[in-house]
């Protein structure tokens, strides 16, 4: 098992394991009860238990293990039973404590408990709850999986679906921003604000915004049921702590009394709150509770103070349960906001990875579950109350009514299946996300590299794709080593869809790592012992002191010089990994004090949460590998290569200069010799290559699978080719290549292939397609489950050549369009019905699968009604098929040239591929020239060549290194050879560049795309040919094509294309009034058809003209809006 390969997909599996092992329990613990009244008694209901099993299927009343491949082959979902329990409680006095202590529901016994079936929850392959977890490669092959199966995806309706990673704002970190939209929040609101995304232990989050108002006041905004609410910050400070105005003033100003900008605003904010005459904490909580009471579902017995506390617990800094911590964080945010407005610090860049983390599959699962549990209870409550309004059922007892309702309620797990199948999120609250669609994609198994790339891709979000600004797409310096600078698509998603670099890790949640949990408790006392002044010791510090925060909790203050020393010590201890207070995955972000305008707000921020980016570098002090985060990287001195190290300045060095690239970008040979866009194109084309997506072809029922028959390992490869086991899934062939302009068939990037090389198998491929045939589809309910495959008329139907005696097609047979495909017995009259093959091209029947019912009860061979047929289509190269080298040099096959006419070298070698030398100068893909050289040397000496980037430089050149190898074998050191014409046998005047290059065959093939039609379907409205290759449509003759014919003056050709071959029509028109709408045909006394103009009352002035039919449609549409159009007919 490849550990490196496993690490690429690990974040997905870790997040799902967090959901199953901890997330479900945390969601249950944090889920809110729902209150309602019945017979003047207050009740509440809440979930008391949630239980997830492992995937099983039911066979004749017996549960047996369900393996992923069964779900793939049968087109079903890989899921497990999900059950829960709901408790009904009577609300008593114990619920009404106002002192802020949380009610422990687990100690309260429910009066009734109801077991509920919540459906079947889709399970991630190879997660802890999957049967493949921990299997050896041999066992995986026995289970019909790949030897290198890594999992990380879900199987829904037979398709492999990936929940794509999304960029989120960094958890629990206050970010200073300018947002123009904030000025619309109300009168006096400015564009200045601080935003913080507070994440609870169960990974659900709430975003709090602190706004700056023109007069110097600040307000905190949060969302509740998609509605915005604002709280004045000074009011909230009093609600969080029983304190005085003097203490609040001192906490914010921190002894900086000469800063009148700050002191004036703080005084004004405090004076404004005096007007309300609310002073104590209890009074403030009562005031907040009374304002919000109408919005909540709480019973009247609940006091305002309790409701006020509930609002603060649920919506204000939810990551901090302690009110004192909430108070200190709000003070810090107010200080940062005033510093930004006063010009002491600048805004933070939300587009930089320093202020970003990632949203993973398991975390979004937890968010959805939390919301669906609430929705489940709300629908239960409304149905129960409705049932008591019904006079027939009003006599039912509450537990009986509740049980009836719970049996009919929706299945929570079905919402997850819908989410994975469509990628759409149906949410009442929006769960603090900026999008509702595009969460899931199908994990294409086009080739191995494309499949792996799905797990490393990270999207900025659907909302940003619609934005016109380009700032969000820019490559930030902070993303070095975390996001790949090369691997992003060209076109619309450029810069929005990035890929993690091959060394980038995503941290696991603290709940999954006991060392992190332990460190979180030990760290405050460790820091206090090393120079930090705890925040609660004194209220006034010098304003120059730095604030130390841990995961959004203010721990204390430190003097700036001591702070710098502390950071060095913490990083050293982190690299050594032997101090229990400092976990290896802790990010130590240090922004030093600066006098520069718009610098970063100074402070030390420590992060131990999950879902953050980290990457390894070598700490020069300890000599050990150390994990660093994007926010701390900004102020670190890291050398890329050893000779860049400056003594006394450089503290770290990169593990490798290629560590900044993604897996795919690292596979491009000699990428440092190429122009950057070509490396980008190669990253895209590697993902479109036909290759070896998997080895378990017989057990796969994917909609479409590609396969190239003669694949090889590349002679020239990078270190990652071995490291990530890419040679187990090769996707190309080492071709002998000549760079020569030979026949004229190689113009414009076209390439000539040696016909004999083609006949030997160069580029030969196949496409596998699977077709599900379900006889119950489209039948009435009466006929379903009564229609079966069969062929009773075997003696007389003359179908022995096509169909077997069971009514199914023969495996291995070549089937052509229109030939009999299968037969079945119609239940209404018991007659045999033959269905023909409707495909457009001939195919081989690779295999036929029989799919039994979900319960597996109908295993009778005579009662088969659902099959899956795998068809194999031949896809050998034809003229127009696309090929490419590994340097973005794409071209189409222009001619299969006979070998006897191919140019040859002195040694008798003939090229497999000829390309034009004009492909190189403008594109500057020197890497390809070096590869041809290295490939030639490798082939001659029989050894693989290392083409990892940045290993050659000006002093030690690649040309010398590989040229030496060629010279030793007796070849020209620059790769040129004397060649002779294949047609005349004469020697070419110049030497030809000749060598070996790895070529890929791309999936864009003429057989899949060619489109031709003479006559066919037309649009009913316009009578023009319809579009679409599948439905037999035509190719559009568009505006540009029209313009070129106009420019050529080819009017007859234009007439033919746009009228005769399109919507030619003969229309009657009145010469007098020029109308085409008022002509009316009738029969005269001799039964002859006569046309007459209704407006002119004349039948003599009617003429017939030829015009496109769509013109009459235009005239009718204009007439509908009271515009008449007249023609002048001579």
UniProtKB/Swiss-Prot annotation:
Source organism, top-level taxon: Eukaryota
Gene Ontology CC, one term: mitochondrion
Subcellular location: Nucleus, Nucleolus
GO process annotations (BP): transcription by RNA polymerase I
Pfam family, one: RNA_pol_Rpb2_2
Primary residence: nucleus
First-level EC class: transferase
One annotated GO molecular function: DNA-directed RNA polymerase activity
Reactions performed catalytically: RNA(n) + a ribonucleoside 5'-triphosphate = RNA(n+1) + diphosphate
CDD domains found in the cross-reference section: RNA_pol_B_RPB2
Keywords noted in UniProt: DNA-directed RNA polymerase, Metal-binding, Nucleotidyltransferase, Nucleus, Phosphoprotein, Transcription, Transferase, Zinc, Zinc-finger
Similarity annotation: Belongs to the RNA polymerase beta chain family.
UniProt miscellaneous comment: Three distinct zinc-containing RNA polymerases are found in eukaryotic nuclei: polymerase I for the ribosomal RNA precursor, polymerase II for the mRNA precursor, and polymerase III for 5S and tRNA genes.
Assembly and interaction partners: Component of the RNA polymerase I (Pol I) complex consisting of 14 subunits.
Name of this chain's protein: DNA-directed RNA polymerase I subunit rpa2
Organism: Dictyostelium discoideum
Gene (UniProt): polr1b
